[in-house]
């Protein structure tokens, strides 16, 4: 009985070891934070049990679009065919072992395509994008390719190069599986439907490796060394250049009109001549990219000495202090509005905001001027001269009455003046008569 228990526990340990890479074993979660913070009680024995049931989230893999000699199944059979001394004297692995080997290599579809076919192939690029577009960028794909290539190269060095006869026999034994895989690959969606715009126009598809060549040809060795040495150099042919729209004739005319009044400082953003020559090379399909127009940043310098249309034309008069302050404020306000119009983009929203702001400033200034005029009128009325809280209606009524009384007094004084003038004329005439009589 104890032997059976120990055997069962040993089997459980082996099962756990076989699926251990799919569990989280790096980080420990705090299920009992209070106990761990107090550190008075040891952790419960059931804390680490639930971690055995946490599986790693794996992204879905797209099926291979390559068929024939470039398919991963051909790589699985041709590159990793077993030797006679590995399976205990048999000539080859069993059908289950071959299926497991093909399935394992299908997971690294991107790796198999990378060292069997040329990376400049358009189908290879689109296949990588379909597999990797919703998880990470091309740098992550290049890193994954370099890591898996290194592991497969080490495995091939340990196992040795297979003989072509055994590879051919392995290919014939697994023909049923290859037919199923090629049928699944033919049902895959064409990447050109999903990505209508080709990523590198200058790259032309190259043929795959011939069946007579070995799994690792010189081109694949050079690809492996270049991938391991410079992982950042791989995304360069896939770089998408940001294009700016070309300048039209209307834009150039507007720029010429603006140059008459403002100072334009242009900053051009140009690409290096090497990249432009590479991008300007003729493509295989005959498509050419539009020329990159320079990005121009403009900065306006508005002159402060502008013509004020509200000012008098030629004659210079001495205005009172209130009138002079009003004219100066009008000039400043006009300059501020001109600066805002030049600095802000020409859109309807900004123009409406500027008009509203200008109207508010002018209205506030008009009210202040009206208030000051009322205060000046109040100071001229004797009855309201010392009344600072007099309302505007009272000021207007008292001012009207005071004006009428002043006008009546003016008429009275004018009549008195006329009477005095007549009296003076009479006295002058009488004095003239007396002088004549005395003489």
From Swiss-Prot:
Phosphorylated by PRKDC. Phosphorylation at Ser-329 by PIM2 leads to the stabilization of MYC. Phosphorylation at Ser-62 by CDK2 prevents Ras-induced senescence. Phosphorylated at Ser-62 by DYRK2; this primes the protein for subsequent phosphorylation by GSK3B at Thr-58. Phosphorylation at Thr-58 and Ser-62 by GSK3 is required for ubiquitination and degradation by the proteasome. Dephosphorylation at multiple sites by the PNUTS-PP1 complex promotes MYC stability by preventing ubiquitination by the SCF(FBXW7) complex. Ubiquitinated by the SCF(FBXW7) complex when phosphorylated at Thr-58 and Ser-62, leading to its degradation by the proteasome. Ubiquitination is counteracted by USP28 in the nucleoplasm and USP36 in the nucleolus, both interacting with of FBXW7, leading to its deubiquitination and preventing degradation. Also polyubiquitinated by the DCX(TRPC4AP) complex. Ubiquitinated by UBR5 when not forming a heterodimer with another bHLH protein, leading to its degradation: UBR5 recognizes and binds a degron that is only available upon heterodimer dissociation. One of its GO terms (molecular function) is protein dimerization activity. The modification N6-acetyllysine is found at residues 143, 148, 157, 275, 317, 323, 371. GO terms for biological process: chromatin remodeling; chromosome organization; DNA damage response; G1/S transition of mitotic cell cycle; intracellular iron ion homeostasis; MAPK cascade; negative regulation of apoptotic process; negative regulation of cell division. The modification Phosphothreonine is found at residues 58, 315. Glycans are attached at residue 58. GO terms for cellular component: cytoplasm; nucleolus; nucleoplasm; nucleus. Gene3D superfamilies: Helix-loop-helix DNA-binding domain (4.10.280.10). It holds the Pfam family HLH. Keywords: Acetylation, Activator, Chromosome, Cytoplasm, DNA-binding, Glycoprotein, Isopeptide bond, Nucleus, Phosphoprotein, Proto-oncogene, Transcription, Transcription regulation, Ubl conjugation. A motif (9aaTAD) lies at residues 100-108. InterPro entries: bHLH_dom, HLH_DNA-bd_sf, Myc-LZ, Myc_transcription_factors, Tscrpt_reg_Myc, Tscrpt_reg_Myc_N. Residues 266-278, 315-331 have a biased composition (Basic and acidic residues). A motif (UBR5-degron) lies at residues 355-364. The 9aaTAD motif is a transactivation domain present in a large number of yeast and animal transcription factors. Transcription factor that binds DNA in a non-specific manner, yet also specifically recognizes the core sequence 5'-CAC[GA]TG-3'. Activates the transcription of growth-related genes. Binds to the VEGFA promoter, promoting VEGFA production and subsequent sprouting angiogenesis. Regulator of somatic reprogramming, controls self-renewal of embryonic stem cells. Functions with TAF6L to activate target gene expression through RNA polymerase II pause release. Efficient DNA binding requires dimerization with another bHLH protein. Binds DNA as a heterodimer with MAX. Interacts with TAF1C and SPAG9. Interacts with PARP10. Interacts with KDM5A and KDM5B. Interacts (when phosphorylated at Thr-58 and Ser-62) with FBXW7. Interacts with PIM2. Interacts with RIOX1. The heterodimer MYC:MAX interacts with ABI1; the interaction may enhance MYC:MAX transcriptional activity. Interacts with TRIM6. Interacts with NPM1; the binary complex is recruited to the promoter of MYC target genes and enhances their transcription. This is Myc proto-oncogene protein. The lineage of its organism: Eukaryota, Metazoa, Chordata, Craniata, Vertebrata. The gene is MYC.
